[in-house]
Amino acid sequence: MSIITESDAPKRAVFLGTALADLSTFPPEARRKAGKDIGDLQSGVMPPDWKPMPVIGAGAGEIRIQGKRAFRVLFVARFHEAIYILHAFEKKSQATARRDIELGRARYQALLRAREGGDQRPT
């Protein structure tokens, strides 16, 4: 018999703003990969293709999904209560678009403000 303690249990995944709706527009294979990678994060395992995104904020990262097209999922996994999905988008050029970085940063800042106010589920 195995006992799962709270610290062993997967973290919740909380999607901020339109991140879930945006992710749902990904092609099926990219959605499956994103789902698996988010599941890995929830279990405390970093996905195989990710990179830190300090430009978004401390502890922010980017899941990279490659195929015929490139997709990205911005996340924060540093808080004990949940994995926060900040933004999901299709990458159309070599550099991440300024608007995607700014949106990720704005949602990260909103998350910090909500946590300071005791609300652990910002919108």
Per-range role (PLM):
Residues 1-70, 79-83, 90-123:
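Basic, Lys/Arg-enriched alpha-helical interface segments
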Residues 74:
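Short, surface-exposed charged micro-motifs
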